[in-house]
């Protein structure tokens, strides 16, 4: 047997050791890459959207919109009173001349839709609002009762973040005068909550993407999911423009008119105009108007359903996660913590308290703090009426049997779908970081 050179043996051993080390490092690097990839994906779900991404998101879920038109009646202006247009269609932000300026601008009613996006850790909430200069009737007996200057109705699209660029549409709530109507697309996990679902949100292909379909009736312009309203005879079908084009209908039967999406928060836009005393009666969002009735229309931050109790005036736009969490059950791990809310950066909370087990019943979000029974009641929480809790990571809630933090207590550090022996026992709570 040939005797091996000790130096060559040592070299071979060193080469083998270095090769093994390189493979080990490579495996570790791959593990770290996979871990970082997962972490980045989770961060992307909670990362604040850029301005360009926001406008793309608004375009992605903007509705195909049916607008019924009535050309008859003293105040119809040949159907133009039902056209969509800009609030400042007459080149000013004066709310008290929109009714009377309509005849002079009747052939230049370029289609606009106002939108705003409020973003939470888990969802985007997109409000779309459609304006007409007149809310009118053809019944002379109702001229002074029903008609008013300016009309703005809209819809809220609830988009769940799922790691994709535009998320997944889960539900919608529309504004029909002083009532809200809720809808879900086929396949949504959303089910009846405090409010019953009013129908299916139809989807239709447009430029290779499915868009929701909404509709308004003529005269009063109530907005619902199509076909609960539909075109009856003459009417216009509006589509969201991908290029910022605001088209003018060719006639009352035009079935393809592009509307321009306008950010409510743009500089000098509708939100900035809330202090304009020629447009609004106050920053709270009630439009001025002096034809037939004083006012009558509202901006999104003043929209209200007259009988839904838990959701307060304006929260449709300013605290949409609250609306979604209360109107629907089956919402999954819906966060009530906002990362972009220009309407109200103090809205939402760290902890959401639910009336019933399995995150059902009314849902009230609270920020960090200590809450006596009186304070809980001010948020709409009744005594001895809580049964499940959602918590943002890194926080805890201590629930007390008695008011002023007395009696038996329980501390919760994560989501709890049913409080068991502490169901319907809380009279005060403390919320803090871990």
Residue positions per predicted region:
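Short N-terminal edge-element motif at the start of the domain
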Residues: 86-169
């Amino acid at each position: 047997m040939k005797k091996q050179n000790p130096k060559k043996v040592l070299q071979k051993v060193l080469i083998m050791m270095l090769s093994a080390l390189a493979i080990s490092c490579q495996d570790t690097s791959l593990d770290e890459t996979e871990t970082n990839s997962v972490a980045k994906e989770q961060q992307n779900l909670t990362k604040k959207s850029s301005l360009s991404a926001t406008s793309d998101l608004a375009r992605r879920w903007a509705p195909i919109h049916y607008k019924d038109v009535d050309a008859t009646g003293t105040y119809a202006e040949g159907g133009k009173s039902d056209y969509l247009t800009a609030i400042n269609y007459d080149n000013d932000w004066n709310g008290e001349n929109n009714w009377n300026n309509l005849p002079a601008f009747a052939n230049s009613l370029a289609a606009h839709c106002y939108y705003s996006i409020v973003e939470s850790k888990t969802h985007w909430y997109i409000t779309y609002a459609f304006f007409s200069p007149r809310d009118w009737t053809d019944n002379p007996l109702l001229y002074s009762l029903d008609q008013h200057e300016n009309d703005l109705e809209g819809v809220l699209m609830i988009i769940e973040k799922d790691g994709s660029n535009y998320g997944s549409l889960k539900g919608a709530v529309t504004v029909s005068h002083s009532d809200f109507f809720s809808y879900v697309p086929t396949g949504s996990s959303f089910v009846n909550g405090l409010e019953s679902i009013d129908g299916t949100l139809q989807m239709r292909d447009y430029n290779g993407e499915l868009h929701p379909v909404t509709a308004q009736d003529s005269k009063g312009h109530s907005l619902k999911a199509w076909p609960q309203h539909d075109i009856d005879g003459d009417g216009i079908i509006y589509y969201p423009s991908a290029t910022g084009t605001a088209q003018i209908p060719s006639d009352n039967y035009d079935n393809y008119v592009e509307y321009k999406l306008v950010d409510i928060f743009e500089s000098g836009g509708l939100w900035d105009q809330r202090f304009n005393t020629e447009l609004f009666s106050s920053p709270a969002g009630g439009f001025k108007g002096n034809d037939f009735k004083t006012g009558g229309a509202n901006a999104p931050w003043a929209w209200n359903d007259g009988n839904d109790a838990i959701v307060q005036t304006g929260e449709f736009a300013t605290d949409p996660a609250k609306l979604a969490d209360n109107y629907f059950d089956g919402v999954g791990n819906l966060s009530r913590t906002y990362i972009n809310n220009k309407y109200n950066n103090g809205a939402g909370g760290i902890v959401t308290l639910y009336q019933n087990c399995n995150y059902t019943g009314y849902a009230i979000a609270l920020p960090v703090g200590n809450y006596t029974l009186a304070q809980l009641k001010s948020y709409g929480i009744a005594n001895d009426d809580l049964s499940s809790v959602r918590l943002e990571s890194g926080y805890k809630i201590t629930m007390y049997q008695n008011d002023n933090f007395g009696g038996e207590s329980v501390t919760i550090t994560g989501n709890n779908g049913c409080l068991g022996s502490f169901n319907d026992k809380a009279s005060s709570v403390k919320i803090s970081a871990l």
